[in-house]
Amino acid sequence: MTAQAPQRYAAGDELPPLARYVTQAVINQYAEASGDHNPLHSDEEFAATTQFGGTIAHGMLVLAYLSEMLTGAFGERWASGGRMKARFRAPARPGDRITVGGRVTRVNNGILRCEAECRNEAGEVLASAEVQVPA
């Protein structure tokens, strides 16, 4: 993905949303790339016996989508000086369409503060984050 030219944001501005689909193939690719081969993510028989009832995406895969949205919004400012405090709220599952969005809550002392979240198509919050980016 090519980062767009950074734009100036003010408190209350919405960040450009991003949508991604979670598939078992994407989860498996993430497992290979990250080295995280927990059977909860890749073994459907095992995962069916857990509280989740099936495989789920790695939480960090969901946060990667959030980071992709922030890169699109802030470009190099996010990549070189951004900070995120995230909370996982619900699992992402194969077949989910994840929409990532956020808004600027405050601009103070050269820092943009944002709230962001990832939701599935049912509107359930999968992850939320407080974000700081150099203005």
What are these regions (language model features)?
Residues 32-36, 71-75, 121:
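Short, intrinsically disordered, mixed-charge
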Residues 48-57, 61-104, 112-113:
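Hydrophobic beta-strand-centered segment that forms part of the acyl-chain substrate-binding groove
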Residues 11, 18, 26, 36, ...:
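A generic structural signal for short beta-strands and their flanking turns/coil linkers
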Residues 1-55:
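Catalytic strand-loop segment that frames the active site of acyl-thioester-processing enzymes
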Residues 1-15, 88, 92-135:
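HotDog/MaoC-like acyl-thioester-processing domains
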